[in-house]
Regions:
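Alpha/beta enzyme core
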Residues: 2-236, 240-274, 278-287
């Protein structure tokens, strides 16, 4: 089966909807790939979803390489995009390229994603020039949560929307192969989608984008009843299913139902009789 590449994703502009989700380890990558994901994002959301932090600012390049490598070991058909964490692309173009290269060389990613508009163009230029495909990210950019004053929809005012459209055009000029639009009014996302020649992938940006992405734990209902944003639609409730399964296991342990004879390794009778004979030794307890 052909592995998805960044040029293949770019060529999907205006075509079949792009299917994207996150994965942070080997088993979730296998699940996402079996389900037919076109893109697997190893997101910095691993900080919240897997590691229990309050925001995405707590992970560094080492953490992202670790989780990206786990996803890559699943050898998915999907394109693996490694998220560049906070402060890994803010200092200089040279440092940005080196950090992106770590996600590719050590992590096994085939592309990287970074947040921001025109002020990130110099960094994107450098990474693209190093022949590493870049996915852009506009709108509600979680790494800017402190500057934005929280997780708020972006582009609701006309001037802010105009600036976002200009940012999208600048990202395309810098060489991105796609753009994630997060927490953006649907009409603004539609304008950007119509304006740029690369696919847009929405998360809380309406149905008019070229594709959609949701965090895999949100889709599967693995949050255990935690708050979900308005744009999330759970398609399962695996957290409750998992609790029920473990409760049944613990009940079976307590009552002695588990393990059964079929779930137990057995010694041949002949060997057992020999072992009983050895029990006459003073060093072996009698049984």
């Amino acid at each position: 089966m052909t592995t998805v590449t960044a040029p293949m994703i770019r060529a999907r502009k205006g075509g079949a909807k792009i299917r994207m989700t996150t994965a942070y380890d080997y088993p979730t990558a296998r699940i996402a790939d079996r389900a037919g994901a076109d893109i697997i994002l190893v997101g910095d959301s691993v900080a919240n979803v897997v590691l229990g932090h309050d925001d995405t600012l707590s992970v560094n390049v080492d953490v992202m390489v670790h989780h990206t490598a786990a996803v890559a070991r699943a050898e998915p058909r999907a394109l693996i995009v490694g998220d560049m964490p906070w402060m890994s692309y803010h200092v200089s173009p040279e440092e940005t390229v080196l950090n992106a290269a770590r996600l590719v060389r050590d992590g096994g990613a085939s592309a990287v994603k970074l947040e921001g508009g025109r002020k990130r163009v110099e960094m994107i230029d450098a990474v693209v020039d190093a022949e590493i495909p870049v996915m852009g990210h506009l709108g509600l950019t979680p790494q800017s949560v402190k500057a934005m004053g929280g997780y708020r929809v972006q582009g609701k005012e006309a001037q802010a929307a105009y600036e976002m459209i200009s940012d999208a055009i600048a990202l395309v000029d810098a060489g991105v192969f796609s753009i994630v639009l997060e927490g953006v009014p649907d009409r603004v996302a539609q304008i950007i989608t119509a304006e740029v020649p690369v696919p847009t992938i929405g998360i809380g940006a309406g149905a008019g984008c070229d594709g959609q992405v949701l965090v895999i734990h949100d889709v599967l209902g693995l949050g255990g009843g935690e708050y979900l944003p308005k744009f999330v639609r759970p398609y399962a409730n695996l957290a409750d299913d998992a609790v029920e399964a473990l409760e049944r296991f613990f009940d079976d342990v307590e009552t002695g139902v588990f393990p059964s004879a079929d779930e137990t390794y057995h010694m041949p009778d002949e060997s057992f009789e020999i072992l009983r004979g050895l029990s006459e030794s003073e060093t072996i307890v009698e049984f």
